[in-house]
Amino acid sequence: MPTPSPVTYPLGGPVIANNQITVDLALNQPALITRRISDLTLQKFIAPLIFTSSGQAVTGGAVRYQQATANELYTSRDIEQRGPTDEYPTVTADRLDEKLAKVEDWGGKFPISDEARKRNNVTELNRNTTALSNTIVRKVNTRTIAALDAAITALGGAGTFVGKNWSTAVTNGVSPTANNALPQSDFAKAQLLADQDELGVTYNLWIVNPQEAANLATTYGPALQALLDYYKIELFSSNRVTAGTAYVAERGAVGFLDYEEGLTTESWREPGKKTSWVQSYVLPVFGVTNPYSVRKVTGLAG
């Protein structure tokens, strides 16, 4: 029988203690594998950093939602000074078009031979579970970045700016890089653009490629954390982000993330091949409701 995770996204919380499970026990209780995958993936997802649950129950394979626009900032008609016996004008905000986010279904399976089961080959089980976990993370993160790119592209350039070259920044020596050409100037510029939008967005998360994370560490060394604290931002690196680019966002404000089914694991035996199968899957649905709460930064590698 399928065994869904009782915990919310990303995939549930770690429960296994000291990895003391047998292959036979795991195959008989697939929930243990679900929890193991949750343990391995807990800190690796981009989606929970920028999306939050809408609180809606997901039915019918899709979720309807509205996406914020710049026209929401002010009413379509200006307010007026009222004279004696006059009425104030009727003011409204523009009505937003509805969008539809479809539920996605991602999963995979792997075999465990009867021999591995009898001999309690925990190494084989762990190797396959880890590989499946990494693949789930890669797929969900790839889809998350694709959703961000689609929303940013729809803004027609308003959601992108060219940053400084982080790979050549120097903070000391005889020829230090000017302050307005250092990586920290991109932190300041991102928030400046958000303030100019007047939509109340505070950028507090930078999602970067490991290359850019390494360049920051090289440039600032032990002072990096103090710099991030000063700008009140958190750094998260992922190989799903193209090298030389970054995404700056307000944590939890970009959109919604729900799921028709959380991470589920099931197992069954195929007698003809003397093999047991382990299958795990997750059915997420997400959408960008506020594209102005995220920006793409390019040119970070020159």
Q: Which stretches of residues belong to each language-model region?
A:
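Short, Φ-rich (hydrophobic/aromatic) sequence segments
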Residues: 24-49, 188-190, 247, 252-263
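N-terminal short leaders/motifs
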Residues: 47-67, 184-196, 230-236
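Charged, low-complexity, helix/coiled-coil-prone segments
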Residues: 27, 63-82, 114-130
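Extended, solvent-exposed, turn-rich assembly/linker loops in the middle of proteins
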Residues: 154-230
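Assembly/oligomerization interface modules of large self-assembling protein complexes
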Residues: 33-106
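Structural beta-strand/beta-sheet cores of well-ordered domains, especially the beta-sheet scaffolds
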Residues: 108, 201-204, 231, 274-276
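Long, contiguous amphipathic alpha-helices that act as assembly "spine/axial" helices in icosahedral shell
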Residues: 93-156, 271-284, 288
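Sequence/fold signature of self-assembling virion shell proteins
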Residues: 2-26, 62, 214-302
